[in-house]
Structure formats: C-alpha cells, structure tokens
C-alpha cells in the first residue's frame, strides 16, 4: 500500500525576517557572552532576534538554558537542569544598565526540579534590576510553577513586576502534544491568582497559531483569558525550530491575525499584539504602555 504524506506548506513571504546583523547586534552578543547570560531570543531561535537586538532590546532567560520539560514546539535545550546561579540576577541587572534599558523582560526555563519552580530567582532579578536602574520597568514571563500559589506570591509580592506574563500557548485540545507536563486549567488559575495578588498589574498571555487549532477554539481561549482577568494578549505564528519538533499544520494569514486582534479588542483586552512574527515579548514596552493607559 502506497502512503502519500501531506505536502509541507510553503513558507509565505510575510514570514521573512532580516538576518541578525549590525553594530548593536554584535555589541549585544558580546555583552551577553561576557556576562555569561542566556537570552530566549537565541535559545528559542526567535525570528525577531535581529530586529530586537538592533533596537537594543532582549529577553533574558534565567535559571540556566536547560529545561526540565519537553514541549513539542520549543527549541530550548531539554535535560538535567543546571545548578541555580545566585549571581545571575546581578549580571542581568548589569546588562540592562549597560544596554541603557528602561524596560526589561525576564523569562526562564521550567525548573520542575525546584520546589518553588525558580520563583525566588525571579524575585531576586526583579529587585536587582530596580535597585541598579531606578525607574526601569520589569516584565516577567513565568512558567506555571506546577500550580504552586506560594511561588506566584514570591514573584508578585511585596513589589509586583510591571507586567506578569504566562503563556497558555495553545488550545486545550492540543495540550497533550504541544505542552507536555502542562495543564490548561492550571495556567488559567495561575493567571487569575496573579491578578488577585496585584490587581493594578497588567497580566498577559499568548498563543501560537498554526498547530491545527480551530478559530472557534482560539476565540474560546481568548474568552477564557478575559474571564480570568488577563489584560494583554499576544498571538503569533508557530514556526517549527527543526525536524524534531511539531510540524506546522498551516500558516495563518496577516488578515486572520487582524480579525483576531479586532475580536480581542471587542472582548475587552487592554491591548492585543497579533501578527505572524509576534512573540510574547515582541514590542513588550509598547504593550505595557497601551495597557496602562486604560
């Protein structure tokens, strides 16, 4: 019996991103290397790396560059995690100062090996940046901490970040294949709890599209996020990092993203960033400013 495989969808022109280049890019790469830091820009093979680094913006990834989970979409290295480096927050703060940042974004790998999921280092990093650069805003993109409310309390109190982000990533039906080890309801609960802890802090979440989800499912997730008091939404195209990762089912057109952005605004999100190359920290400072005007 002859089995015919479905053809791989051709990559459309709207997903072309410029290759990393320029003085700012080279200077930032040297700085990250010298301070022994990691960025999700590099580790997750972000298509916007060149644009963002030339704008002197980057998303720092703390707690090492080895993740304890094996999500089917993610390019970050998987395996046994590294020891926690308690000097890392100070080095992140130094990098932010040398880059002249007024808005810093910090994320991490999953650290299911630690009781608090790494929340303590998020707290230390937030405090280190603010101490070194008074007035610098700090957004954090956190894992689900395996549903541990005490971990979220560590991140949000006593002084909350300027934005708390936790991505739901996809629709519930696809969780088993896309987010192994995660649960949709748990992510919603952590977003709701973060907002309860600091009602004035914008809460943010995002999804990747193109993994086989239906538009009706995406709209339902958006409604769920609003019901759990999420303020900022990001929607972007899933891009397959390698042949070992989940295949792209389809490319979502810019017009479809525009329609979802309008739907999100109608639902009451303070800001919706939607487009093929959008990632959770893409133009994060603009998203914060738009959300806090409401």
Language-model segments: what does each one mean?
Residues 113-124, 148, 174, 179-188:
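Active-site-adjacent beta->alpha loops and helix N-cap segments on the catalytic face
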Residues 1-59, 90, 94, 124-135, ...:
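Auxiliary Fe-S-binding modules of radical SAM enzymes
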Residues 77, 109-111, 141-145, 169-171, ...:
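Active-site beta-loop-alpha junctions enriched in small/polar residues
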Residues 101-107, 158-172, 229-239:
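Non-cysteine beta-strand/loop elements that form the S-adenosyl-L-methionine
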Residues 40-52, 63-78:
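Local cysteine-cluster metal-coordination motifs and their immediate loop/turn environment
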Residues 78-105:
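Conserved alpha-helical substructure of the radical SAM core
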Residues 104-124, 212-217:
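Conserved glycine-rich "GG(E/T)P / GGGxP" loop and the immediately following alpha-helix
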Residues 62, 73-86, 139-148, 208-215, ...:
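Active-site mouth loops of central-metabolism enzymes
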């Amino acid at each position: 019996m002859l089995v015919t495989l479905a053809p791989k969808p051709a990559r459309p022109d709207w997903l072309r991103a410029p290759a990393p280049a320029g003085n700012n890019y080279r200077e930032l790469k040297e700085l990250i290397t010298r301070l022994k830091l990691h960025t999700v820009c590099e580790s997750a093979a972000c298509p916007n790396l060149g644009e963002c680094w030339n704008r002197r913006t980057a998303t720092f990834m703390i707690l090492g560059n080895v993740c304890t989970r094996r999500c089917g979409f993610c390019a970050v290295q998987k395996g046994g995690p590294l020891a926690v480096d308690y000097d890392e927050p100070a080095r992140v703060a130094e990098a932010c100062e040398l880059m002249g940042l007024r808005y810093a974004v910090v994320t991490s790998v999953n650290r299911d090996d630690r009781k608090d999921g790494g929340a303590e280092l998020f707290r230390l990093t937030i405090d280190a940046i603010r101490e070194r650069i008074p007035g610098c805003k700090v957004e954090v993109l956190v894992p689900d901490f395996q549903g541990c409310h005490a971990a979220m309390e560590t991140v949000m109190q006593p002084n909350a970040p300027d934005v708390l982000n936790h991505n739901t990533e996809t629709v519930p039906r696809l969780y088993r294949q896309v987010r192994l080890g995660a649960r949709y309801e748990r992510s919603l609960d952590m977003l709701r709890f973060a907002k309860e802890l600091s009602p004035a802090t914008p809460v943010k979440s995002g999804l990747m599209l193109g993994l086989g989800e239906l538009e009706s499912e995406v709209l339902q997730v958006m409604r769920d996020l609003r019901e759990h008091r999420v303020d900022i939404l990001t929607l972007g195209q899933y891009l397959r990092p390698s042949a070992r990762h989940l295949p792209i089912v389809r490319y979502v057109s810019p017009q479809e993203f525009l329609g979802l952005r309008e739907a999100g605004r109608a639902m009451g999100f303070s800001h919706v960033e939607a487009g093929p190359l959008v990632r959770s920290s893409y133009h994060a400072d603009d998203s914060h400013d738009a959300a806090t005007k409401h």
